[in-house]
């Protein structure tokens, strides 16, 4: 834009001076030639300044990230990790999650269930325990290896979809496709020109909210942690898709500990046990249908979620 504007300005000014007799036609042609010669260097300079500005902004952001200090650290002398199939418990709410079961937590206040998910996964200050050992007394790497939090705002990054779903690159295609099936994301994959080798745009902008949620769920299932905690994993999908996910999730996580924060009847009807959270405390536990019949507060919370559909 600016180089072109320079040529227009020089031509106009030169023509005006030539008409007034202050510039000869030969001088005008020569001056125009000089201006045209400067167009390419000027354009290159402008582009370089723009790229330098963007680079400086990006560098400052990277530096800010690199300077961040993690809020959580491993203790100086970590406690011994409990064995597999350990019970997960949160004294603050009274929730106890039996090992190997699919447990749901229902709360009328989403912030309460999200806070519980953060405590159970040691992404916030907590006195939660695994096998009777406080999470914050275990080595942080051990906790991250054994417990995975799938939060409400899934994030996708730029790159190939295969690398997005399987960052380690250790998983074969058959296992990846099985996880995609469990997350009911086959239609998302089918719509991509190169399927698993398709490029994902920044933040997954080419996908809808429901598609991003299912791809992130696929990634969580492929991680295959001992304990998977999911905060509203189906909030952005339609009822038919949610029902398929609920059915397949149970099979995909069979024998492993899974906690789902949700108010969806479609999911609740397929879990082993439901815990009702009121005011941040567990006030009732049991099968979905029993709580639906016996507990008015539970019935009101779940029915409201059903009406939202």
What does each model-identified segment do?
Residues 1-29:
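A hydrophobic transmembrane-helix motif
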Residues 2-3, 25-47:
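Hydrophobic alpha-helical segments in the permease module
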Residues 38-67:
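Cytosolic ends of transmembrane helices, especially the final helix of ABC transmembrane type-1 domains
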Residues 66-109, 251-254:
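Primarily ABC-family ATPase nucleotide-binding module
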Residues 75, 263-264, 269-309:
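C-terminal portion of ABC ATPase nucleotide-binding domains
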Residues 83, 162-201, 226, 247, ...:
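ABC ATPase nucleotide-binding domain helical subdomain, centered on the C-loop/LSGGQ "ABC signature"
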Residues 186-215, 219, 230, 237, ...:
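ABC-fold ATPase nucleotide-binding domain signature/coupling loops
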Residues 223, 229-230, 235, 254:
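Conserved signature/switch motifs of ABC ATPase nucleotide-binding domains
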């Amino acid at each position: 834009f600016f180089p072109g504007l320079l040529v227009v300005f020089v031509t106009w000014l030169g023509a005006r001076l030539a008409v007034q007799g202050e510039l000869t036609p030969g001088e005008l042609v020569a001056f125009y030639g000089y201006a045209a010669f400067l167009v390419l260097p000027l354009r290159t300079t402008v582009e370089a300044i723009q790229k330098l500005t963007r680079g400086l902004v990006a560098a400052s952001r990277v530096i800010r990230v690199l300077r961040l200090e993690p809020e959580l650290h491993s203790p100086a002398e970590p406690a011994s990790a409990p064995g597999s199939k350990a019970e997960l418990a949160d004294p603050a709410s009274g929730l106890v999650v039996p090992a190997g079961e699919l447990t749901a937590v229902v709360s009328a206040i989403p912030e309460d269930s999200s806070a519980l998910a953060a405590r159970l996964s040691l992404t916030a200050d907590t006195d939660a325990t695994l096998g009777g050992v406080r999470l914050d007394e275990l080595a942080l790497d051990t906790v991250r290896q054994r417990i995975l939090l799938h939060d409400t705002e899934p994030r996708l990054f730029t790159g190939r979809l295969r690398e997005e779903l399987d960052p380690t690159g250790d998983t074969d295609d058959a296992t990846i496709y099985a996880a995609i099936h469990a997350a009911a994301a086959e239609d998302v994959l089918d719509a991509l020109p190169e399927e698993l080798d398709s490029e994902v745009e920044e933040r997954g902008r080419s996908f809808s909210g429901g598609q991003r949620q299912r791809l992130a769920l696929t990634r969580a299932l492929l991680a295959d942690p001992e304990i998977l905690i999911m905060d509203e994993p189906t909030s952005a999908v339609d009822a038919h898709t949610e029902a398929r996910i609920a059915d397949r999730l149970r099979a995909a996580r069979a024998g492993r500990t899974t906690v789902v924060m949700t108010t969806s009847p479609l999911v609740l009807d397929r879990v082993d046990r439901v815990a009702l959270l009121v005011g941040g405390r567990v006030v009732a536990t049991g099968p979905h249908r029993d709580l639906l019949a016996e507990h008015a507060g539970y019935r009101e919370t779940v029915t409201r979620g059903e009406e939202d559909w």
